[in-house]
Amino acid sequence: MAERSELHTRNKHNGQYDFSLLTENYPPLRKFVLLNPLGIQTIDFFNPHAVKALNKALLISYYGIRYWDIPRNYLCPPIPGRADYVHYIADLIDPERVSNTANEENGDKPKRQCRCLDIGVGANCIYPIIGHVEYGWMFVGSDIDPVSIENARKIVTCNPVLAHKIDLRLQKDNRRIFDGIIAPDEYFDVTICNPPFHSSKKEAEEGTLRKLSSLKGEKVKKTKLNFGGNANELWCEGGELRFLLNMISESRKYRKNCGWFTSLVSKEKNLDKLYAKLKAVHVSEYKIIRMCQGTKNSRILAWRFLE
């Protein structure tokens, strides 16, 4: 699992992890490093303490983040995959209008900083960290969970590179997505989201068991949700499909407040219903951006209103 392929060309995490660099910058990672059957350094990705240590080492080594922590039972995301989403979203940004360091290398003269809204920022605050460090974007991160907001705020406060660049907002109505977060006179160049996959706690547990069984090559009978995330990070009523249908409906109201609306879509079977909803709200353009991280295939749904 130390190797990944076909990540975005600007992703710093292409190839194998450089454990010499990572352990030098974050020595506590050393005790988790082992050799796989091919003699390649890796960690046990089923050990949440090892994954957390790896994340800390990656954030220190590649993003200059000196403090990062998450509460117990909260989602510890794979950074290479999160970075891929950010880099593909950067390709959507119009270099004639906003600052984007990926385009500045080509001699473009940006006019202002990009503003990005992260729906469901989580306690880990990963997307704003990567987006700001890589591209200088300004972020607003929203979440329905007060603990997530406070933890993300602590990460921002403890890292000078992030100070005054990331604004955290609590969504007080868990039935809403943009309502109560976007002010009437506010504008975002893009919104991003990694929605809850499942429709119930039971479905989330079954999905985690299937994933672990597939990865380990053997049947796993028991698991704990705290390995893969807090309840609101993993499931919501109606699951991913209902969440995204609601997001598309609300996006029409905020068509003048946002350039691009985007979200990850975990289940490809949901796409046809999402396409139908996009047509029903009369979007001007929509597209699917496909990503590949090793053996995992994922996709971004992006849409916009041009009025």
Swiss-Prot record:
GO cellular component: cytoplasm
Record's keyword terms, sorted: Cytoplasm, Methyltransferase, rRNA processing, S-adenosyl-L-methionine, Transferase
One of the GO biological process terms: rRNA base methylation
Single GO term (MF): 23S rRNA (adenine(1618)-N(6))-methyltransferase activity
InterPro entries noted in UniProt: METTL16/RlmF (IPR010286), rRNA_lsu_MeTfrase_F (IPR016909), SAM-dependent_MTases_sf (IPR029063)
Reactions listed under catalytic activity: adenosine(1618) in 23S rRNA + S-adenosyl-L-methionine = N(6)-methyladenosine(1618) in 23S rRNA + S-adenosyl-L-homocysteine + H(+)
Keyword Metal-binding: no
Subcellular location: Cytoplasm
Broad class of where this protein is predominantly found: cytoplasm
Signal peptide location: none
Gene3D superfamilies: Vaccinia Virus protein VP39
E.C. no: 2.1.1.181
Keyword rRNA processing (UniProt): yes
Cited Pfam families: Methyltransf_10
Similarity comment: Belongs to the methyltransferase superfamily. METTL16/RlmF family.
Function: Specifically methylates the adenine in position 1618 of 23S rRNA.
PANTHER family documented for this protein: RNA N6-ADENOSINE-METHYLTRANSFERASE METTL16, SAM-DEPENDENT METHYLTRANSFERASE
Protein name from the UniProt record: Ribosomal RNA large subunit methyltransferase F
Originating organism: Bacteroides thetaiotaomicron (strain ATCC 29148 / DSM 2079 / JCM 5827 / CCUG 10774 / NCTC 10582 / VPI-5482 / E50)
Gene from which this protein is expressed: rlmF
